[in-house]
């Protein structure tokens, strides 16, 4: 006989865990740049939709299809007998619950590899995680495998879900390499802020809410007083650890950086949730407090370590949240377990090193297996598909190149649609993309120059010798343009992000299959004032830097300047320009 209350509770937990996908999507989108928002939303949708059939086909069977030491069994499409699980809920309810857990492990990886991963590659490795990686690790810990038989304890997935996803996230981010512009030539990291902190915060609130289903639902039961008491403790410990971790992270960043860091504090909330997940059923509230306390410190130190020392670029902090705190939460069981629901009490509760040793053994072996398998998967993907997108795609944004989406925010293009989706044709292609081989006519067509007529200024003088050069260019060309101007000796420039209305013929971005006619396109306007340096040299350097062989590469305006005043010193004209050229 099935228990109706247990069935309902498990389904509620499953639905909450499913809704975590929305939280992850908002977090990742908010903590990254706007030009990749559509790509991130697609990834978080597709890892669940790809993982669900994969887990049904063989994943669930590998995880729960038997009690073998290494794998459960090979049971395609879940046709076998699962009575050995001893469930008092329908099998399909349990399958739904485990499916959403599998999806969570897969979606964790998305954040650390954001803004530079080939979308095809993402789909393939998401399938691999759901087919063989997560199920086999899950079998060892939850499905009757060798770790479970040794007494390894992971109530709701600090190790099985978050550590596994975090290890893959770390490996993937390391193999991909950092985003363009993340580190300078000396290895110093540069901040690349996310574009929407509100979305990131909303994602954290959603995840926190859903974690009550993630941890609380893992009891699978509310039918007895004992089950209700344990579930209540699980939910209380979950909330307490997250709250403490959040406070600690806020205070720690306040002391460390001089101001309380918002995005780091949001990560602190998630760190506390991850850390308490393994032991929420076996630690006391005092244990939960200390687990959350350490998690709040660990997430900050981990982010700094991977950013500054390891040079692993993790845009959303997924490695620090899920890997570092998944490891910590799993170890914490061996320290703070009261002995309830574990074979041995933790070290601090008189149980010695037995439980701690089992937890450490489990972490090492699981992580070793995951690293070996996913290293092979990533290498194969890189060889046959390509793991990382080309530099041009990364600079323009994955939305326009991977999905034909000019912007996730209607009316404002975040990616430069002209360069990203250009289809060479008679309207735009000038026939030569190498500036060293292009004719003057081709270069002038790609980057036209407009010069202001010299007016009479005073005393019959037509030209002061000072000029302002205003250059309108594509976002992706800024670094080349800046380098070209610096090589001439121009070090002072004003750079403005501007939006232009219109669309270049030959672009192919669409929304719901319908071509987009008009949008606001992002450009940069670079302005320099020169006197000693030849204005013609500046113009020629800019034309060569911007040229790609298409109409619309840029435009240059040259103006006469009558007077320049440096506010700080009061110097005027030529003297005022000497430290910027």
Each PLM stretch: what is its role?
Residues 1-457:
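Glycine- and aromatic-enriched membrane alpha-helices
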């Amino acid at each position: 006989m099935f228990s109706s209350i247990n069935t309902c509770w498990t389904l509620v937990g499953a639905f909450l865990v499913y809704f975590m996908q929305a939280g992850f999507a908002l977090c990742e989108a908010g903590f990254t740049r706007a030009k990749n928002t559509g790509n991130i939303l697609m990834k978080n949708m597709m890892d669940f939709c790809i993982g669900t059939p994969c887990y049904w086909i063989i994943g669930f069977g590998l995880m729960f299809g038997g009690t073998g030491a290494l794998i459960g069994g090979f049971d395609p499409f879940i046709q076998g007998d699962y009575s050995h699980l001893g469930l008092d809920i329908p099998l399909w309810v349990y399958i739904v619950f485990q499916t959403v857990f599998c999806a969570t492990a897969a979606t964790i990886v998305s954040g650390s590899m954001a803004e530079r991963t080939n979308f095809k590659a993402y789909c393939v490795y998401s399938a691999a995680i759901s087919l063989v990686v997560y199920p086999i690790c899950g079998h060892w810990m939850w499905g009757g495998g060798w770790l479970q038989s040794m007494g390894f304890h992971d109530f709701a997935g600090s190790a099985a879900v978050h550590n596994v996803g975090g290890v893959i996230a770390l490996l993937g981010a390391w193999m991909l390499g950092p985003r363009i512009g993340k580190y300078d030539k000396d290895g110093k990291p540069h901040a690349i802020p996310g574009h929407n902190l509100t979305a990131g915060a909303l994602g954290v609130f959603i995840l926190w809410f859903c974690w009550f289903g993630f941890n609380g639902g893992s009891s699978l039961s509310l039918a007895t007083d004992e089950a209700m008491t344990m579930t209540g403790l699980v939910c209380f410990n979950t909330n307490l650890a997250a709250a403490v971790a959040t406070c600690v992270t806020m205070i720690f960043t306040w002391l460390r950086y001089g101001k309380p860091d918002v995005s780091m504090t949001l990560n602190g909330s998630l760190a506390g949730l991850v850390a308490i997940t393994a032991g929420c059923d076996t630690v006391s509230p005092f244990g939960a407090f200390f687990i959350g306390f350490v998690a709040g410190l660990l997430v900050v130190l981990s982010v700094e370590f991977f950013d500054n020392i390891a040079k692993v670029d993790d845009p959303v902090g997924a490695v620090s949240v899920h890997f570092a705190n998944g490891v910590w939460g799993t170890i914490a069981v061996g320290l703070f377990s009261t002995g309830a629901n574990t074979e041995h009490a933790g070290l601090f509760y008189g149980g010695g090193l037995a439980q701690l040793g089992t937890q450490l053994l489990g972490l090492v072996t699981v992580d070793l297996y995951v690293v070996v398998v996913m290293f092979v998967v990533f290498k194969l993907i890189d060889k046959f598909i390509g793991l990382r997108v080309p530099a041009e795609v990364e600079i323009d944004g994955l939305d326009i190149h991977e999905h034909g989406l000019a912007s996730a925010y209607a009316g404002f293009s975040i990616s430069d649609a002209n360069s990203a989706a250009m289809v060479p044709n008679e309207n735009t292609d000038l026939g030569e993309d190498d500036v060293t081989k292009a004719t003057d006519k081709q270069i002038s067509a790609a980057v036209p120059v407009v010069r202001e007529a010299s007016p009479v200024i005073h005393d019959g003088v037509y030209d002061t010798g000072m000029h302002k050069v205003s250059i309108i260019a594509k976002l992706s060309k800024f670094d080349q343009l800046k380098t070209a101007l610096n090589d001439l000796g121009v070090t002072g420039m004003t750079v403005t992000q501007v939006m232009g209305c219109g669309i270049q013929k030959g672009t192919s971005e669409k929304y719901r299959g319908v071509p987009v006619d008009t949008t606001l396109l992002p450009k940069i306007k670079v302005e320099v004032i020169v006197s000693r340096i030849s204005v013609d040299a500046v113009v020629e350097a800019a034309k060569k830097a911007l040229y790609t062989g298409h109409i619309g590469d840029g435009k240059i305006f040259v103006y006469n300047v009558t007077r320049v005043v440096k506010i700080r010193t009061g110097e005027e004209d030529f003297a005022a320009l000497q430290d910027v050229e």
